[in-house]
Amino acid sequence: MYPRRAAARWIEGYVLLEFTVTKTGAVRDPKVLEAKPPGIFDRAALNASLKFKYKPKVVNGEPIEVSGVRNRITFELTDA
């Protein structure tokens, strides 16, 4: 969800996150690596990442956890 304050001021930006993808494909321990502008979209990006679902990596027929996964979330406004 776009932060209300940022939307009202037409602020756009991005957040680069790093997290672990669990054996079930869920996101665990997301953290902000980089954000522009800093502090504006961090919470929204962290909350969104916890809803992500990945297909877990499989090794020898078994799902495994993968740490250090990165995802950049971009926040852009459009004229609707």
Model feature map: region roles:
Residues 1-8:
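Short, basic/aromatic recognition patches
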Residues 8, 38-39:
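Loop/turn elements at beta-strand to alpha-helix junctions within RNA-recognition modules
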Residues 16, 64:
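Short, flexible micro-motifs
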Residues 22-34, 43-56, 66-80:
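Conserved "boundary/linchpin" sites in short secondary-structure elements
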